[in-house]
From Swiss-Prot:
UniProt-annotated binding residues for S-adenosyl-L-methionine: G73, L78, V124, E125, R138
Gene that produces this protein: rsmG
Subcellular location: Cytoplasm
Name under which the protein is recorded: Ribosomal RNA small subunit methyltransferase G
Organism field: Actinobacillus pleuropneumoniae serotype 3 (strain JL03)
Keywords: Cytoplasm, Methyltransferase, rRNA processing, S-adenosyl-L-methionine, Transferase
Amino acid sequence: MRQKLDRLLEQAQINLTDQQKEQLVGFVRLLDKWNKAYNLTSVRNPDEMLVKHILDSLVVSEHLQGNNFIDVGTGPGLPGIPLAIANPDKQFVLLDSLGKRITFIKNALRELGITNVTPVLSRVEEYKEQTFDGVLSRAFASLNDMVDWCYHLPNPQGKFYALKGIYAESEVQEIKNPIWLEKVIPLSVPELVGERHLVLLNKPN
């Protein structure tokens, strides 16, 4: 699996240390193991997880601006854990409303020695502890849902980072809250079939 990860990272032009690579491989192994009992992801094959979960998360890394981020509807820690491994200088809150997912994340953090992640079991609308430089998610079906549920989370300079498959302009027009579209970045994920986009949105100051 490590060789496959090395190859994918090289194709994506992402530079990581050996320790970071071992943490990513360890995370996939844990996800594969826990998935058999807890059904955390529909992706069953560890090699596929490297593409659809790890690389799909890591390609966002170079676009992150700021130091503290929240991953809303993180599921088993995606994109939060791969991004936290790749950015040990940044802090990540991983939010999910399902206990088994947070239990898995806590276990993974402990086993992999990841110290820059705080897992939180909560519904997003009830989480009011702090604001963030970036609100990340690949969980929401629509941009309107993401902005609506998470509108209280960015700080005044903060952004929404929506990880999407196909991007449709009409989705931005459907957003009810005041928002402006900063940019849409096409993402290239090695060996992934289909389009990926990162949509950056800002609240007006």
